[in-house]
Amino acid sequence: MLSYDGAAGYPFRVAGTRVCALLGCDLKGRSFSALFAPDSRREIEDIIAVVSEEMLAAVAGITATSQDGAPAHLELLLLPFNARAHTPLSLTGLLAPFGGGHSVLRDFKLTSWRYLGHQPQKTVPRALRKMAIARGFMVYEGPR
């Protein structure tokens, strides 16, 4: 789970055991965008912004470098996470390697990405929806 805080580099709020093992350390509080090579940082930050602000899911292909210099291919799924109104924006997701047996990974690079879903419908409270439909002069019947 990532916090939507661009100034801090979108830090991890919580990270699972497998993700921490892939990166060789506990990720809580560490910057997500700092995992990426400098030439991919801006792109991943743009993807995070689209997922959070437009409430769209994103799937990305990532290539990382292992400790022995071999490339490792991963898949990233980012989903908007908005539990309640007036709570901080955050994201949840999945980072999974293709194949296994990778040592600690570094220097992530985006190879591809796409957005899933459609523009969500804005939900308006029911009372306001009724008022948007009602136009002009209205007569309400009262008790007789």
State each model region's role.
Residues 114-128:
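A recognition module on extended beta-rich or small alphabeta surfaces enriched in W/G with H and D/E
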